[in-house]
Amino acid sequence: QGALSKAREGCYSARRLEQVNDELRERYFLAQSDGRFKVVPSLAARVCCARLNVLELAKAPMSGMDVIFCQNLLIYFRRWRRRDILNRLAESLAPGGLLVVGVGEVAGWQHPELVPVADERVLAFTRKG
């Protein structure tokens, strides 16, 4: 099953949710009869999973995004192209939005509207405002 199909389904094994605290799990997931957990409909309705060409982000109808995950992709591009892609993604975020990128995929990149998240487990940035 493809990654986008899995994301749209919004169903996760208990193992996948081990790092999610009980309060969040109870608030945002419904236990299923097969032992998996499904994202609650009110949250699932707010999620957009789309296949995009990162080299054509200017054409993508993306703006005001709350969260963007871009992991295990940037390593395939030259440094200048990575920066271009990251700048476009940063511009697509809503104020307070979160950009999560793969650890080790970005070195020395900064954007004037983004602030690094202080967490050693992830490489992420929030948009000012």
Regions found by a protein language model. Give the residues of each.
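Extended basic-aromatic, gly/pro-enriched interface segments that bind polyanionic ligands
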Residues: 1-69, 73-81, 106-108
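Bulky hydrophobic/aromatic packing residues
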Residues: 15, 98, 112-114
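A generic structural signal for alpha->beta connector loops
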Residues: 44-46, 96, 113
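Pocket-edge structural micro-motifs
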Residues: 51, 103, 127
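Core SAM-dependent methyltransferase catalytic element
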Residues: 67, 108-129
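A short glycine-rich, Lys/Arg-flanked "PGG" loop and its adjoining helix->strand segment in the class I
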Residues: 83-95
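Conserved beta-strand signature within the Rossmann-like core of class I S-adenosyl-L-methionine
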Residues: 95-103
